[in-house]
Amino acid sequence: MSPESKGRQASQEPDEVIEELIERGERAMDAIADYDQEQVDELVQAAAWAIYEEERAEEISAIAVETTGLGNVADKTAKKRRKTFGTLSDLLGEPSVGVIDREEADGITEIAKPVGVVGAVVPSTNPGATPTNIAMMALKGRNAVLLSPSPGGLETCEKVLEYIHAELEKVGAPTDLVQMVPPPVSKAKTYELMDRVDLLQVTGSANNVRRGEQSGTPNYNVGEGNAVSIIDETADLDATAERIETSKTFDYATSCSSDNSAVIVESVYDDAIAALEDAGAYRCDDEEREKLEATLFPDGAGSLSGEITGQPPEEIAEAAGLENAAAREADFFLVEGRGIGPDYPLSGEKISVVLTTFAVPDFDGALETTQEILDYEGSGHSCGLHTTDEGHAERIGHAIDVCRLLINQPQCVGNGGSFENGLNVTLSMGAGTWGGNQLDENLDYTHFLNTTTVAEAIEPDPPTEEDLFGSYLDEHGT
């Protein structure tokens, strides 16, 4: 964007700013309307390479940590590269232009078309990875995307945009395919975007998600996390502890899929805690647990402190006044759950390297406690099970109302898809109607396609009444 354009937009009303950006996005879409599948896939590759290149990924991550104060550079760099690589693997070669499916016997042909200008509200926890991920999926459908960063994520998003534009120019595509709401960041402009785009995707605060759902714009907004892991009596405890440590500590638990609670069958509780300690955890006593709770939720009403979220463990220990030297050297903290619900905020999402543990008498109790935690916070999002009992793996799938359930995997790594499971790679995960979402799966490129279904006349071959009603009438009569 030219300095003149930036200056003009700074003096415009929010509705004028968003209207201009949408018009530019629509013109960019017109310019690629005739792109074939190969050209579209090249757009996706361009957006991916913009932040996958290692030096860029590290630079963007450093900006994100400096400006948001959340997470750490090494993990953010790894996340950008892993998620971008995985998403690109999912997208390349998949049909998204013109005829994408034809069923000759049924006379059905499906033709893919763009959804329009996509609005994406970007969270401060992933200010570099999320906009690129959304842009790749939107471009796969020949859409334009308009990004709305958080105040802390503005500089990161600007750098991401700079690199995406450079790559789009290399392939001769209009840079207005990917734009950003210009600074200063404001709710007025973000809300205007929510109201005016053709399709909306909000990943972030509960307030933004709720406002996006109330906009009336078709949306794929996603619910809050509060991932729970069950450790049953058959689990390999050392392997389980390593998985939970990975999930709990990665990027200082800024992910919505980071484990927040571990529900442990009583017969292995002490051994599981010991394994977690061996993996780097510090087990807090009652006094230390109270100190941590007061530090994480200083208002006493369950509101999470922004000063503590996404911080290194040593800083949390210092802020909470944990004087034990082992606490200052820990990778994460264990606190015993005393209850579930608003009066027990440690049972909710903490966005910090603090894991709440619950002892339960048996697997039935584990299922009951897990659902109770999710009913309080994180409905529909995710949970995990560490087990060697295949029967337990199937039972939990029927019993717990979540959209993704990982067996013997670190949730932070696996919920958003990986090469170790069959889930689509994404940074936006729907929680279904349980979480108040329209989306009940991992966001992918198919959500950014409109489809025209052409139905040709075929030779009729209807069933008989006997085919449809025979079994019912045999059982119940006429």
Question: Where do the model's predicted regions map?
Answer:
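Structural signal for hydrophobic packing residues in well-ordered secondary-structure cores
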Residues: I22-M29, A33-D36, V44-E55, A64, ...
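Short, flexible turn/loop "capping" segments at secondary-structure junctions
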Residues: L21-E23, N221-G223, Y252-C256, Y344-I351, ...
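Rossmann-like NAD(P) dinucleotide-binding subdomain of oxidoreductase/dehydrogenase enzymes
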Residues: V97-A239
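ALDH superfamily catalytic-core signature
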Residues: S5, Q12-P14, T132, K140, ...
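N-terminal Rossmann-like NAD(P)+-binding subdomain of aldehyde/semialdehyde dehydrogenases
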Residues: M1-T109, M137, D278
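Conserved C-terminal structural/oligomerization subdomain of aldehyde/semialdehyde dehydrogenase
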Residues: K6, M29, A33, E323, ...
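Flexible, glycine/charged-enriched surface loops at secondary-structure junctions
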Residues: D34-Q39, E58-S61, P174-L177, Y252-S255, ...
